[in-house]
Amino acid sequence: CHFKHRKQRFVDIGDSLLTLKLTHALSSSVQNFPSDAIKILNRLEELDLSNNRLRNVPDNSFHFLRSLKKVHLQDNTIEMIHRGTFQGDIHRDLTEVYFSFNSVRNVQQHTFADLIQLEQIHLDDNRIESLERRAFMNLKSLKRLNLKGNKIATIAYETFQNLPELEDLDLAYNSISSLDFNIFDQVGSLGMFHVNMSHNKLINLVVAPSVPFEQDTGLGGLQNIKVLDLSFNNITSVAKQFFRPVELSLMQLYLGHNKLLNATKDLFGNMPHLQVLDLSHNSLYELDFDTFRNTKKLQWLDTSHNRISEIPNDLFRFLGNLRIVDFSHNRLRSLPDNLFRETGLERLDVSHNLLGKLPLTSLSLASAQTLSELDLSWNSISSLSHGGQLARFKCLSWLDLSYNRLGQIDAGTFKGIPRLASLNLGHNSQLTLEINGLSFQGLEYTLLHLNLDNVSLSQVPALSTPNLLSLSLAFNSLPTVALEVAGNISSLRYLNLDYNDLSAVPIVTHSLTELRHLSLEGNPITTLSNTSLLGAANQLEELNLKNIDLTVLESGAFCKMQPLRTLKIGVYRNIKNFNIPSILQFNDGLKNLEIHVTKDTDTLDNEMRGAWPLKLQNLTLSGKGLKKITGKMFQGVRSPTFHLTVRNTSIIKIPFDVFRNMLPVRNVSVDVRDNILLKNLQNPSTGSKPGKPRSAFLTDLKLMGGKWSCDCDLGWVEVWERKRRQYLCPVLLRVSILRNIIVGTLMMVLGTGCVRIKITGVWLKFLRVILSVVGVKLRWRN
């Protein structure tokens, strides 16, 4: 569109048009905002000129648009927003303004002022270096101000003036080197105020000199910040009383991924409403005994990934609201007696430390009775002798003792834990179990998940656990699994037998009628016949056969497995004319396929030639043996939606032919993380936009972990990101980066690396607490 005869362009609809969208519509030669053509649209409420090449927006561009509510100008090349562009007496209905992904360098005084209905301003991913005083002024309805991804180094006092309803101020990914709470003196006094200053250049947090209070302009008093995120900076020291202005308001404080050395009462001891404190990934050596003296509402404390070697006995005295404590990845050799005195503790993580014994005496009877999850993995615990103290854990449902030095589990050890549902004893290589099953006495009807990986088993112990859902026996020396085992684990749905001495698929799988997931990776199985999987064929949904040197694979081995949804296999060189599509021709429901290559292989053209199952939409290629992929390998893809993962291979280049030959594909996503040799990935999109006939568009891309060169071969990524924002990321659906970080933090804790991540009641309850502070409502069904 060149806007010839601009004044006549919208004459006929000037009094009726409410919404005008010209995204990616203007000629590249149009650099000036087309105000002459648009000014006659006097009833226009929403204007979208995003994804063009606009450079200049004159200050009178919107003066005739008195009904304007939303302005979308993101993804242009705008260099300046002139003072007076938006005026309070004209734009009384304006609610949202988007200038994201432009080239704005500064925000002048009164650029956004006296706009009584304005709720959102988005200036993220520009080149803003400075914010002038009173740049944002008298915006009484403003709730979100997004300034992330700029070059802001300092923020002047009174930059934000009279913004009483502000809830979310995002300053992440800037160059801010100092923090003065005085800049928030007139911000967020009436709402739940969140400040995100993560990923900046903060080093030393010092107390700023006080600023004289102006009665006629300021709101005065202490700050109303509820959530403060200072993570991913370089903070090495925090001055005493630094948090004094926000002590009475803070509910969540995030200081993870910094370089703090200690935690004291002067910093965290007087925050009466603080519920969440994240000090993870620092260099903490110690916590003072009175660190939380008057911070009595603390519910979640994370001090993981530090250098703490000792915990003071009185650290948690009188903290009756404490629910989750994470001491993992430290240097603790013991925990003091009665460290946890109050009732209410639900999860304790002391994994990856140096504990030599169970810290049972660290919990009083009151705290032990409410504990639901206990993680003691990766320590040096050698004995579970407890003198009956385990019986105090009446609510314990999740216990992880993996990667310790346990030698023996006596009969009835867990008998006093009536609700234990998940038990991990894996990787205690010297562990001796009672073959008659007495080691698990008392857990017969409560145990749902059991991990016995790498515990030197030569036979499966007797398990009288009819409700057991998952059993992991990987990295043992099992030559077989006795058929009689099935009778006592009749509800089993997941069975992991990786890296044992199995020479054939165990017949016991034929009797496990509820089995859905079976993993046999790394066993010396050489033959897979038409009857090997016959017993499980009618219900199995996932099968892992990686790292197996098959010499015989009968053509009907998988043909009866109609419910199969996920298959992981290798490239079996000892099988003549091995072809994957041919062995899967009857698996119409297969959606996910992983092909693992261990031995050096140039291509898989022959192995992958042919038509793939119609619903196959996720293909993973893994293994150092794979050196090259070609377009011929993907000619058989038939699903219109396709996700390609290339993980931990020796591939150097992924050519365009790979994607050009996926003829039926319309939406493609690519994950090429962790390929240390990969240097070149050509554009997977064969069309210029989504929905274009006979072409595919890239919907998602993950690149981390390669040896990428920022040259022309990778330059397409920037153009694609622009199009993705335009077509796939509607502005109205964008979520606050602060909320993402908070939810992401929870998900990182939840992702324990277990075979099955179990979101327990502890986390569901606490998730509500966290998200309620950031304005997100959580619902779930039991």
Swiss-Prot record:
Gene Ontology biological process: cell adhesion; visual perception
Residues carrying covalently attached carbohydrate according to the record: 196, 234, 262, 454, 488, 530, 618, 648, 667
Entry annotated with the keyword ATP-binding: no
Subcellular locations according to the entry: Cell membrane
Superkingdom, taxonomy of origin: Eukaryota
Organism of provenance: Tribolium castaneum (Red flour beetle)
Main location: membrane
Stated role: Required for photoreceptor cell morphogenesis. Mediates homophilic cellular adhesion.
Alphabetical keyword list: Cell adhesion, Cell membrane, Glycoprotein, Leucine-rich repeat, Membrane, Repeat, Sensory transduction, Vision
GO CC term, one of those recorded: plasma membrane
Record protein name field: Chaoptin
High-level lineage: Eukaryota, Metazoa, Ecdysozoa, Arthropoda, Hexapoda
Protein encoded by which gene: CHP
SMART domains: LRR_BAC, LRR_SD22, LRR_TYP
